[in-house]
Amino acid sequence: MTFKDKVYIVTGASSGMGREFVKQVSKKEKFDEIWVIARRKEALESLKKEVKAKIRPITLDLQNPEGFDTYKKLLAEEKPEVALLANIAGYGKFGKYDEISLEDCRGMIDLNCKALVAMSQLTIPYMKRGSKILQLDSLSAFQPVPYLNVYGSSKSFVLSYSRALNRELKTKGIRVMSVNPGWVKTEFFDHATKSSNDAITYFNVMYDAKDVIKTAIRDLYHTKKDVSIHGFQIKAQVLLVKLLPHKIVMEIWMRQQKHK
């Protein structure tokens, strides 16, 4: 296949981590265009005023299967060389199991897992040696987390999928890295905790999206890591989770949240 323009593709680019990623990554290596994908057209359009790079807003609902038909056709028509795919779109609802609707449960799986896989599968054929895939994951991927049971499980899937895919694509010279932050103050966080009532009340440390993204980009371009973790406390927590039985880890979490 003969490729045309060299592009970056970023999902979830309308706000939070995705928007911050676009701002920072636009200053990296030379490329022709950044395709920014999200549902809110106005928010995507406004990125043009904040980023000097050429931006192409693409309004898609990644929870709707028809969105992938549109994306597939766009790739076939444009035939871009995709130097970077950043799957940052995500959906979370935190709280007690009976306070989260079935619609939200299915929505988390659809966007966090199914959409991420679909974007990866459709995009890889347009990548060359040296291309990269970044998957926004979560600290919750490393352990079972009560009151984040569906969200955390969806992120465990992302971690396993990303690491396995990274190994598969090694011979093609395509890199896959998951980014596993702790608590980050964003619009996503506000939405996820909005209906959690008293289920989650303790947040040990809150990070800034700018710092998490800065670390992620550094790790993506200057290391061979398949997992990026920002912050000493989060790195220590990941190590602890690996050393202790998950039953004990869950008990510690429950006590932190003041649940029996």
List the model feature ranges, each with a label.
Residues 30-46:
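Conserved glycine-rich Rossmann-like NAD(P)H-binding loop of the short-chain dehydrogenase/reductase
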Residues 96-97, 104-106:
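Substrate-binding pocket helix/loop in short-chain dehydrogenase/reductase
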Residues 88-93:
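Conserved NAD(P)H cofactor-binding loop of Rossmann-fold oxidoreductase domains
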Residues 171-232:
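SDR active-site lid
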Residues 14-15:
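Conserved glycine-rich cofactor-binding loop
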Residues 138:
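Residue(s) in the substrate-gating loop at a strand-loop-helix junction
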